[in-house]
Regions:
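N-terminal helix-turn-helix DNA-binding core of bacterial DNA-binding proteins
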Residues: 25, 29-72
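C-terminal regulatory/oligomerization modules of transcriptional regulators
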Residues: 1-9, 115, 130-153
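Charged, amphipathic alpha-helical coiled-coil/dimerization segments
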Residues: 78-137
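Generic leucine side-chain signal with a strong bias for well-ordered alpha-helical environments
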Residues: 35, 51, 62, 80, ...
Length: 153
């Protein structure tokens, strides 16, 4: 049976969740460094990427994607609107709600940051011991497992 203690010394991983946390922190630090000077941090870049792909999305959909509380997303959206990178548009079916979309300035900021993101991505992918598609599938499986565990908790 594998030792599941939280090791501080040695090369052996401690637990899947702890290693996931460490990996997330390392990825955020790498992206924050790569994106320095663009005005976007790793979280901004991820949100802009989702908005660019979705076109328009409700704050609730963004909250589910981010696995974040609605209040966190609301604060984030307000900051991006104030920056002029995101605009709120009325929801076509629900007048009480709105959708968010990138402005032209937001798309430009995302494109500029993307030019710095791609070399960081290429460096990480080149260092992987297996194909990036396999690693990405494992990460998607892990996220699904964490989501399922959160539902049961």
């Amino acid at each position: 049976m594998r030792d599941r203690s939280n090791r501080v010394k040695g090369d052996e991983p401690s637990t899947v969740l702890f290693d996931t946390w460490l990996t997330a922190r390392a990825a955020i630090a790498l992206l924050d460094s790569a994106l320095a000077g663009t005005g976007l941090d790793a979280e901004d870049f991820a949100v802009y990427s989702v908005l660019r792909q979705a076109g328009e999305i409700s704050p609730g959909e963004l909250a589910r994607w981010m696995s974040a509380p609605a209040t966190t997303v609301s604060s984030h959206v307000k900051r991006l609107v104030a920056r002029g990178h995101v605009r709120q548009v009325p929801h076509p079916e629900d007048r009480r709600s709105y959708r968010i979309t990138l402005t032209d300035a937001g798309q430009h900021a995302h494109t500029t940051a993307g030019r710095l993101f791609l070399p960081a991505l290429a460096t990480v992918e080149a260092a992987l011991p297996r194909p990036s598609s396999d690693v990405q599938q494992a990460l998607q499986d892990l996220r699904a497992a964490i989501g399922a565990a959160a539902q049961r908790a």
